[in-house]
C-alpha cells in the first residue's frame, strides 16, 4: 500500500445520502476475490444514466468523491472499497460513514474523511461552480482545501498513522518478521511453521 500524506485531485460531487455498498458495487460483481478489475462495476446501476456525475466530462479522472451522509452502509463487502480504488478514488469525503466501510477503507489505502454536513454542502457548491476544480487533501493537517476555502476533517489517529506509513494488514505483520522468525526458530521442529516469503 502506498503512503498517503497529501492528495490533490479533481473532486466529484455525489449528491446522494445513504449510499450503500450494493449501490457502490452490485452483488453480481462480487464473484472475484482479486482487488482489481472492478472499476466498470463502480456505481453500475447509476452509470447507465448519461447525466450521472461520473459520466460527465468535467469530472473525468476524479479522485476525490464528496458524498452525502451515511456513505458505505449495508453489507460489509471489501469490494466496495476495491471498486472505488480501482476507479481511481483516493479520498471519499462525507459527513458520516458506516463503521465497517470506514475500517475497510483505511486498510486498503482509501481515505474516508469525515466533515460536517455543512462543509459537504460547501464543497458541493464549489465543485458545481467550478466543474473540474481540484481538492487538496492533507492528511497531516487533516484539512481539505478547495477554491481558497479550507475545511477540517476527522480521522482516528491509528488509521491516519497507517495511511501515512502505507501499512495494510500484511505490512503491519511484516514489521514483526524478525520476531516471527525468532519465535518459529525456537519452536520444536514437529510443530507447524510459516513458509518462507517468496521474492
Curated annotation (Swiss-Prot):
Which is a GO BP term held by this UniProt record? L-leucine biosynthetic process
Q: Quick one: a GO cellular component term?
A: 3-isopropylmalate dehydratase complex
State the Gene Ontology terms under molecular function. Answer: 3-isopropylmalate dehydratase activity
Name the UniProt key words of this record, in alphabetical order.
Answer: Amino-acid biosynthesis, Branched-chain amino acid biosynthesis, Leucine biosynthesis, Lyase
Q: Which domain of life is it from?
A: Bacteria
Instruction: Give the EC number.
Output: 4.2.1.33
Q: In which pathway does it act?
A: Amino-acid biosynthesis; L-leucine biosynthesis; L-leucine from 3-methyl-2-oxobutanoate: step 2/4
Which SUPFAM superfamilies does the UniProt record give? LeuD/IlvD-like (SSF52016)
**Which top class of enzyme applies to this chain?**
lyase
One Pfam family per UniProt: Aconitase_C
Membrane-crossing residue ranges in chain numbering: none
**Could you tell me what reaction this enzyme catalyses?**
(2R,3S)-3-isopropylmalate = (2S)-2-isopropylmalate
Asked whether the keyword Protein biosynthesis is assigned, the reply is: no
Q: How does it assemble?
A: Heterodimer of LeuC and LeuD.
> Which family would the database say this protein is a member of?
Belongs to the LeuD family. LeuD type 1 subfamily.
Protein function:
Catalyzes the isomerization between 2-isopropylmalate and 3-isopropylmalate, via the formation of 2-isopropylmaleate.
Protein name, entry field: 3-isopropylmalate dehydratase small subunit
